[in-house]
Amino acid sequence: MKEEDSSFKLCVPGIVALQSPPNKAFRSTDTVGFLESELKKLLGMQQESRLWKLGSQEGRELLTRPEITVVEGEGYEVQRRLRHLPSPISVAQCLLLEEKGEMGNWPPE
């Protein structure tokens, strides 16, 4: 089975419009933790951050398990429902990386 690279649209709070938004390719076997780490480097973020997936059926889903891989495939949805795992990230979705403010607060939802 061949690993495919995927790139995701990145949403950055506080930046209205980027002429060419940051784009980074990831493998389906990369973990959410690796994705967050690479995006922080790409954006030069120093503070604590959290990663959201936008555009899912739930609307906005916080990705809290850094060990989960970026997976798409048959059977994953069934496992997700049984084990309450986050749904897989698809290319059509947007990732939102939030950084904790200087006062230690998260941006308002």
From Swiss-Prot:
Coiled coil: none annotated. One of its GO terms (biological process) is cell differentiation. It comes from the Eukaryota. GO terms for cellular component: Golgi apparatus; membrane. The keyword Membrane applies. Keywords: Cytoplasm, Developmental protein, Differentiation, Golgi apparatus, Membrane, Spermatogenesis. InterPro entries: Ub_USP-typ. Residues 24-109 are annotated as: Interaction with GGN. It is a peripheral membrane protein. It is found in: Cytoplasm; Membrane; Golgi apparatus. Pfam families: Ubiquitin_3. May be involved in spermatogenesis. Interacts with CCDC159. Interacts with GGN. This is Putative gametogenetin-binding protein 1. It comes from Homo sapiens.
